[in-house]
């Protein structure tokens, strides 16, 4: 299977196709762009290897009743592509939760994604939507960090 070269335009188009109108993501068209040796890291986990990465994507889709992403910006410099996004996750018992973040994709010599690093404020974005945690969390953050 021949895949196209990842550029700002192709990443925007491919990632936009991931989230359908039912809110259940389908990453299968993206998996060919990942190296077998992909290292994925975000604020809560580090995953090594394509099989483990694909399993993590499946778990995330299974846990959410809906999952949507709005791409705000896609920028490329050499072998690094940056995405700025808003991901909205819905769970059965909780309100929709928007996460504001970015992803750094690093391409190897073959043009495959060898590293993906996601940056977001998991706790702040989630605590903002939990009635009893929002006020104490914001008070703590303001007091400790200004």
Task: List PLM regions with ranges.
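Soluble or luminal CAZymes and related metallo-dependent hydrolases
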Residues: 10, 52, 97
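A beta-strand edge to alpha-helix "cap/lid" segment located at domain peripheries
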Residues: 62-68, 75-146
